[in-house]
Amino acid sequence: MSQLKITQVRSTIGARWKQRESLRTLGLRRIRHSVIREDNAATRGLIAVVRHLVEVEPAQTGGKT
């Protein structure tokens, strides 16, 4: 399954409780903090709630093979 890199780009000041909880569930704590999550329906739902606070891009699967 593919993965997504999610980066918080805006502050939670003034954000609603549901948006703050969604960021916390994703594992984001501060601006410019990034996490890698599986691309599934649950993750996409959380991203939809906070789409104005985050940037989403495909995760790079780097490493030596």
Swiss-Prot record:
GO terms for molecular function: structural constituent of ribosome. The keyword Acetylation does not apply. One of its GO terms (cellular component) is cytosolic large ribosomal subunit. The keyword Coiled coil does not apply. CDD domains: Ribosomal_L30. GO terms for biological process: translation. It comes from the Bacteria. Keywords: Ribonucleoprotein, Ribosomal protein. Part of the 50S ribosomal subunit. Belongs to the universal ribosomal protein uL30 family. This is Large ribosomal subunit protein uL30. It comes from Mycobacterium tuberculosis (strain ATCC 25177 / H37Ra).
